[in-house]
From Swiss-Prot:
<dbReference type="GO" id="GO:0000781">
    <property type="term" value="C:chromosome, telomeric region"/>
</dbReference>
<feature type="compositionally biased region" description="Basic and acidic residues">
    <location>
        <begin position="73"/>
        <end position="89"/>
    </location>
</feature>
<dbReference type="GO" id="GO:0090734">
    <property type="term" value="C:site of DNA damage"/>
</dbReference>
<dbReference type="GO" id="GO:0017053">
    <property type="term" value="C:transcription repressor complex"/>
</dbReference>
<dbReference type="InterPro" id="IPR000953">
    <property type="entry name" value="Chromo/chromo_shadow_dom"/>
</dbReference>
<dbReference type="GO" id="GO:0005730">
    <property type="term" value="C:nucleolus"/>
</dbReference>
<dbReference type="GO" id="GO:0005634">
    <property type="term" value="C:nucleus"/>
</dbReference>
<keyword id="KW-1017">Isopeptide bond</keyword>
<dbReference type="GO" id="GO:0006974">
    <property type="term" value="P:DNA damage response"/>
</dbReference>
<dbReference type="GO" id="GO:0005654">
    <property type="term" value="C:nucleoplasm"/>
</dbReference>
<dbReference type="GO" id="GO:0005721">
    <property type="term" value="C:pericentric heterochromatin"/>
</dbReference>
<feature type="modified residue" description="N6-acetyllysine">
    <location>
        <position position="40"/>
    </location>
</feature>
<dbReference type="GO" id="GO:0043021">
    <property type="term" value="F:ribonucleoprotein complex binding"/>
</dbReference>
<dbReference type="InterPro" id="IPR017984">
    <property type="entry name" value="Chromo_dom_subgr"/>
</dbReference>
<keyword id="KW-0539">Nucleus</keyword>
<dbReference type="GO" id="GO:0042826">
    <property type="term" value="F:histone deacetylase binding"/>
</dbReference>
<dbReference type="GO" id="GO:0044877">
    <property type="term" value="F:protein-containing complex binding"/>
</dbReference>
Length: 191
């Protein structure tokens, strides 16, 4: 189910903001360090799809659902052989409709968009963690920018282990049990 999000109305009063319902999150990109999502708006055709900054959105379930699919797609790309079969090549040469060309350009652009560590930014700290995508993911804050990306914990463990350790240390709690305190007092009294 879509959620409402603010989007400026195309009216003469630029201060008015209306709320529209997001039907689906279609893609993700980072522009100048800011995460944006390509949205399909409920009740509007695909030609009205827009890129919206993450901070303007109020649809965490749809974003989470998209990230699950995105992660699976990324893993699939890494496991796919690079060569295409001859039949696939022929098939793609015959599909030249405007829609096919548009969707091909969108796919090419989305594949070129760097995400997470691919952006080449230096990690500053981990803001939070989630397993909503099936694997443990960290919300990584980058140095010299206000932006953050979800990154695989496995990747963060290798690329910035000290930041991962600091994240866990900040959340580490010790539980003292009354019997432990009594035993320590007895040992101290004996010495």
């Amino acid at each position: 189910m879509g959620k409402k999000t603010k989007r400026t109305a195309d009216s003469s009063s630029s201060e008015d903001e209306e709320e529209y319902v997001v039907e689906k999150v279609l893609d993700r990109r980072v522009v100048k360090g800011q995460v944006e999502y390509l949205l399909k708006w409920k009740g509007f055709s695909e030609e009205h799809n827009t890129w919206e900054p993450e901070k303007n959105l109020d649809c965490p379930e749809l974003i989470s659902e998209f990230m699950k699919k995105y992660k699976k797609m990324k893993e699939g790309e890494n496991n796919k052989p690079r060569e295409k079969s001859e039949s696939n090549k022929r098939k793609s040469n015959f599909s030249n409709s405007a829609d096919d060309i548009k969707s091909k350009k969108k796919r090419e652009q989305s594949n070129d968009i760097a995400r997470g560590f691919e952006r080449g930014l230096e990690p500053e700290k981990i803001i939070g963690a989630t397993d909503s995508c099936g694997d443990l993911m960290f919300l990584m804050k980058w140095k010299d920018t206000d932006e953050a990306d979800l990154v695989l914990a496995k990747e963060a463990n290798v690329k910035c282990p000290q930041i991962v350790i600091a994240f866990y240390e900040e959340r580490l709690t010790w539980h003292a049990y009354p019997e432990d305190a009594e035993n320590k007092e007895k040992e101290t009294a004996k010495s």
